Amino acid sequence: MNSAVDTICARATAVGIGAIAVVRISGPEAISIVSKCFSKSLSKVDSHTVHFGIFKSANGVALDEVLVTVFHHGKSFTGEESIEISCHGSPYVQQQILDALVITGCRMANPGEFTQRAFLNGKMDLSQAEAVADLIAAQSKKAHRIALNQLKGNLSSDLKVLREELISFASLIELELDFSEEDVEFADRSQLKDLVSKVLETVNKLSSSFALGNALKSGVPVAIVGAPNTGKSTLLNQLLGEDRAIVSDEAGTTRDVIEETLNIDGILFRLIDTAGIRETNQNIEAMGIERSQQKIKEASIVLCLADASDVNNLSETQTWSSKLTKTHPDKEIILLSNKSDLLKNDVEEGISLSAKEGIGIDALKSEMVKAVVGEMDLENDTIIANARHHEALIKTAEALEKANTGLHDGTTGDFIAMDIRQAMFHLGSITGDISTDDLLGNIFSKFCIGK
């Protein structure tokens, strides 16, 4: 497909005051339009060259000293003739440059239009285009790595292999349908069963990685829970390395939920210090406890904090932790025995620590990372972090399950072929091999303008 024939422009850097800013132009008239506002002609310069000069308004008034970088057709991010203007970071100067470009023949770009043109011009597939937005929004090392791997085409390569296998499968089934009257079987059913099972296993593996990918992308919610005065706020402060929560000997000091972020080994954790859970007659504290219960439901990891110096509290917390493990199998429940510095011997269950003295904090951090990553290799494994991709993989798996059932039940080839085509369609929707205008509009509208 070819992109729109007009030439677009927008800020490529964030709005606001800075040392420099970049204005991006892309389209068939990019070089011609900028040349009209620049102090020298750019029509014969080489691609990937940088030129210093004065940028002028449509009336010829000098606006700024700028650097202009030229990219020829087929050699730019969008695949089109493109220019990037590096100017001083004054919002006024940026706007004056944009105004001059619009008067001279540019149109202001829509959100994500530069990346959309890159997709339409075959510079990247749809999953790579979405990775651009994820790369910009990445808040941690691991989220950055997942987005970068996707941008490099790791996911695209995996899906290409799967689609090629399904195409090979479908072609044999379709060939049988063409010769149905001759009762010829081109495809060995046992081999087809093995192929579908193999593809289905890979699709399910990719799909199951979404929980990890989404957590790494959005931050892993961690609820710190326990009875009043067990040291939850002290633990939060120790993990953060600062006094964020009020610490007091008085039970019920924390009456609301406190949320902070913590980066451990490149993984972003969203720590939630909750109100101590106990029976209370005070309305404000009761509201805090109710919110604590809700945060437990929302968390991926629950840190159950016990006061190891209090035998009754330790026993109750151990029992409660075991119940949470059974009632919330989708969550990682970690039992923590706090105030271990007051004991002669370590507690056998859970992690022994002293939030006050910082003892056991490194062990806790390691356990939190292990709870998130498990056996996954974040550097090399393909991990799904996009909800649209996850939904498409689920639909792919459903279609393959139907095909697999049909093969085992002796279903006729036309129904099996239909299921395989559905699986291919959903896989293709991830990379954009199969897409609709509505889908593209929804995806690229979420990008920032200038990207």
Predicted feature descriptions by range:
Residues 65, 80-84, 113, 128-130, ...:
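Acidic-residue sensor for enzyme active/binding pockets
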Residues 285-309:
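Inter-motif core of Ras-like GTPase G domains
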Residues 1-145, 149, 153, 327, ...:
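A glycine-rich (often HGG/GG-containing) alpha/beta subdomain
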Residues 2-11, 15, 141-263, 280-282, ...:
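C-terminal-of-GTPase-core extension/linker across diverse P-loop GTPases
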Residues 52-72, 252-280, 301:
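Switch I (G2) and immediately adjacent beta-strands of P-loop GTPase domains
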Residues 271, 305, 336:
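Generic enzyme active-site microenvironment
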Residues 122, 229, 273:
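Conserved G/P- and acidic residue-centered "switch" motifs that form tight phosphate/ATP-binding loops
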